[in-house]
């Protein structure tokens, strides 16, 4: 039985990579070869194809998530509530603040400068630089798909054969590696750890999704906002580091109290 759960994370990540590339290929062929839309027009509106791809991925992985854990549907979980929704957003903002500090450091290290440049170029290319497309893909769709995959499927499978702390750490490292950029991998791993802690505590996928959403929202705003607004955003996310740390530490202490009862 444990061997089955050991294989699920590997197979789920492989399925995501394979399905993403296959869907993009099919959409591209459909648009260029069937509808005979020019490559330039396709590039200008390719974000609609990406949104469609993410919609399919959400459907596929949410269905897989439900099928895998259908027998555990009655497990205790924290209902959605304003306090935890706000707390999750604060954690996401705080993680973004730490990420900003890490990127500033990485920019000063010659060995990491190319990784920072590649990461920035990749962010600019999301949805062809279209604000609406970037919001729908990076801020809404990506957090849903990735949290279902890495917290709902990968992490939850690892709970079956590893201690909670080890499962959170390993799944978070996989989440970081998945981003294929050493600078991005570092802060994605940190975000994965905090999202994993909240999911382990609450057993409600909405909370890690909100952490991811808040982080990506700030990143998007920084990419589109003028420099004056960016300065205010930077101050805001730095201020959020302390309350974010408090919320995560409080969750860990509550876990310990629950274990001792």
Named regions from a protein language model:
Residues 53-58, 134-138, 187-195, 238-242:
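Hydrophobic core segments of transmembrane alpha-helices in multi-pass, intramembrane catalytic enzymes
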Residues 17, 21-29, 172, 177, ...:
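Functionally important transmembrane alpha-helices
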Residues 6-14, 51, 85-90, 132-136, ...:
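Hydrophobic alpha-helical transmembrane segments
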Residues 85-103, 169-191:
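Hydrophobic alpha-helical transmembrane segments of integral membrane proteins
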Residues 145-170, 197-204:
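Membrane-interface helix/loop boundary segments of multi-pass membrane proteins
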Residues 36-45, 72-142:
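Juxtamembrane helix-loop-helix connectors linking adjacent transmembrane helices
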Residues 1-86, 93, 97, 217-261:
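N-terminal, membrane-interfacial amphipathic/helix-forming hydrophobic leader that caps
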Residues 32-40, 110-115, 157-165, 224:
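Membrane interface segments of multi-pass transport proteins and intramembrane proteases
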């Amino acid at each position: 039985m444990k061997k089955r759960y050991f294989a699920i994370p590997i197979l789920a990540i492989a399925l995501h990579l394979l399905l993403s590339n296959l869907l993009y290929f099919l959409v591209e062929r459909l648009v260029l070869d069937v509808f005979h839309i020019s490559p330039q027009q396709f590039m200008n509106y390719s974000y609609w194809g990406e949104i469609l791809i993410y919609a399919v991925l959400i459907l596929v992985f949410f269905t897989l998530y439900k099928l895998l854990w259908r027998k555990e549907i009655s497990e205790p979980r924290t209902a959605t509530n304003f306090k935890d929704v706000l707390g999750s957003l604060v954690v996401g903002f705080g993680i973004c603040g730490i990420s900003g500090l890490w990127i500033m450091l990485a920019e000063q290290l010659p060995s990491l400068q190319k990784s920072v440049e590649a990461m920035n170029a990749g962010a600019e290319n999301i949805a062809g630089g279209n604000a609406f497309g970037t919001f729908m893909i990076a801020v809404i769709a990506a957090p849903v798909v990735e949290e279902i995959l890495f917290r709902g499927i990968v992490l939850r499978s690892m709970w079956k054969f590893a201690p909670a702390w080890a499962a959170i750490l390993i799944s978070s490292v996989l989440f970081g590696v998945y981003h294929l950029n050493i600078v991005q991998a570092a802060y994605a791993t940190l975000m994965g750890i905090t999202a994993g802690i909240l999911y382990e505590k609450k057993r409600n996928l909405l909370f890690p999704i909100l952490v991811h959403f808040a982080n990506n929202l700030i990143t998007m705003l920084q990419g589109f906002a003028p420099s004056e607004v960016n300065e205010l955003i930077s101050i805001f996310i730095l201020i959020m580091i302390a309350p974010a740390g408090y919320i995560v530490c409080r969750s860990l202490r509550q876990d310990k109290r629950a274990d001792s009862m």
